[in-house]
Structures are given as structure tokens and as C-alpha cells.
Design a protein with these regions (language model features):
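Long, charged amphipathic helices and adjacent flexible linkers at domain junctions
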Residues: 89-98
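Single conserved hydrophobic/aromatic residue that forms the stacking wall/gate
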Residues: 231-239
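Intrinsic disorder/low-complexity signal
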Residues: 9, 139, 236-237
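Generic short alpha-helical hydrophobic face used as a protein-protein interaction/packing hotspot
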Residues: 65, 111, 179, 236-237
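Aromatic-lined carbohydrate-binding/catalytic grooves of carbohydrate-active enzymes
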Residues: 100-230
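N-terminal accessory beta-strand-rich subdomains and adjacent acidic, glycine-rich linkers
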Residues: 1-89
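Hydrophobic positions within alpha-helical membrane elements
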Residues: 66-67, 145, 239
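A generic structural signal for short, solvent-exposed coil/turn residues
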Residues: 15, 25, 37-41, 48-50, ...
């Protein structure tokens, strides 16, 4: 849950003055960051894959490439550090069509409706968004499976047409006709135990045998090294 990022700075560094260094681990899994001052008053900074529960066995002739770390320095405070890092990421890491485009201003229905929505109140939100000259409506959690609360349905990525009072395509068309783009929420890395997917593939959940699993928002984490990755990708395409 923590951002794999650290800053080392002089105690007097501010947003606009002073020296600071940052290390941004370009990896989304478990990580370990450590700073140590030795007997010569030199600071040693380490950041990488968390070695507590990680191991990787290499066979003869194989290799393992560790994730990269982006190192940044500023002599003009934290703001300059942030700007330099942002520019580096935009120029070298972002690969999608959004790399050099201004992001759309959007409205997300979640805080307005949570799970309790239908086509009519989604269209009402979209109309207000269009009147305010926003760019996009994003349909959040609850559009799929049996998903009226956070105890069930996550992982069943098929459209709940009863809830939407029709097909997803029909809803999207109405939103597009207002001049808005349409976005759809996914949480592909999680699963509800009360779901068709879990009942079919309980082994896809990331749990330690013989131990009580850790749940967050009544959900388990999927083991993305399994076929669930292909399943979720196919389901997203179908939706």
C-alpha cells in the first residue's frame, strides 16, 4: 500500500531551496527501502524488491533482471525534484496514447451513488457533467455480476443488465451522444469469495494454506501469475 519512493534531504530543505535526492522504485510489488549512516557519516540508501519473502531460483544459463530505480537530484528544493521526476516519467515511462495529451476532466459516480444506481441516475449525472463542460463520465464499482455491496460479485466481470436497465452499449451511446467520453471501473487484482469466479477457481486467490487469509474490503488478492490475468483481460474486452 505504500509508495515505493523515498527522499533524502537536508534538514533545512524547503519547496524552493536546498538539496534533496529521491529514489523511485519502478515496480508495483513488495519493496524494501533502507537508509543507513555509517561510521564515516556517509549515508547509504538501498531500495529494491522486498527480500523478506522473495526468492528466485535460476537455472544454468538463465538470468534475472531486477526492476529499475529512478534517481533524482535537486539543488532547488522539493518542487524542482518533483518537476524533474515528472518530466523523466512522462518522457521515458508512459507509453500509452496519453503520453503527451492533456488528461480529461471527469466525474465518477461512486461518491454520488456507491452501489445504489441505475441507468436513470447515471444519465442524470452525465447531463450535469455535460452542462459543466466536463469531458468524461466514469462508471464505478457495481456495474457487474451480483454486486450490490462489497461482500460479493468482485471478479464476475459480466454486465448486470438488470441494474443498468439495458445493455452497457446502450448506456455508453447515450453518454457519447451528450458529447462525453465513457470510462469503466475495474479492480482486476481482487476477488470476492462470494463470486462465481472464486467458486470456480478458489486456487486463484492469494492465500497461505492453513492460515486465516487477510481480507481488505471483504476481498482477497488474486495471484496474477495464474490464468486469472487472461480471464480478466478477456472479460474486459467482452465488456
Amino acid at each position: 500500500q505504500h509508495n515505493p519512493f523515498v527522499i533524502l534531504a537536508d534538514k533545512d530543505t524547503t519547496e524552493s531551496t536546498g538539496e534533496c535526492y529521491s529514489a523511485s522504485f519502478l515496480y508495483s510489488g513488495g519493496f524494501h527501502a533502507q537508509a543507513e549512516v555509517d561510521q564515516f557519516n556517509q549515508t547509504r540508501l538501498v531500495i529494491g524488491i522486498d527480500d523478506y519473502d522473495f526468492s528466485w531460483k535460476l537455472k544454468k544459463g538463465e538470468s534475472f533482471s531486477t526492476p529499475e530505480v529512478c534517481l533524482t537530484y535537486s539543488a532547488d528544493g522539493f518542487s524542482k525534484l518533483s518537476q524533474t521526476l515528472h518530466q523523466a516519467i512522462v518522457s521515458n515511462l508512459i507509453r500509452s496514447c496519453w503520453k503527451d495529451r492533456v488528461r480529461p476532466i471527469l466525474v465518477n459516480n461512486w461518491e454520488a451513488t456507491y452501489f445504489d444506481f441505475n441507468k436513470d441516475n447515471l444519465i442524470a449525472i452525465a447531463k450535469e457533467a455535460a452542462e459543466l463542460n466536463l469531458d468524461m463520465l466514469v462508471l464505478d464499482d457495481g456495474w457487474f455480476g451480483k454486486r450490490d455491496d462489497d461482500f460479493s460479485g468482485l471478479g464476475d466481470w459480466f454486465v448486470n443488465e438488470k441494474k443498468l436497465c439495458g445493455t452497457l452499449s446502450e448506456l455508453v451511446k447515450e453518454v457519447h451522444d451528450m458529447g462525453l467520453s465513457f470510462g469503466l471501473w475495474f479492480e482486476p487484482e481482487m476477488i470476492s469469495e462470494d463470486s462465481d469466479l472464486y467458486r470456480a477457481h478458489p486456487d486463484w486467490a492469494l492465500v497461505i494454506p492453513g492460515r486465516q487469509p487477510i481480507r481488505s474490503r471483504s476481498q482477497l488478492v488474486l495471484d496474477m501469475s495464474r490464468d486469472c490475468l487472461l480471464y480478466t483481460s478477456d472479460a474486459a474486452d467482452d465488456s
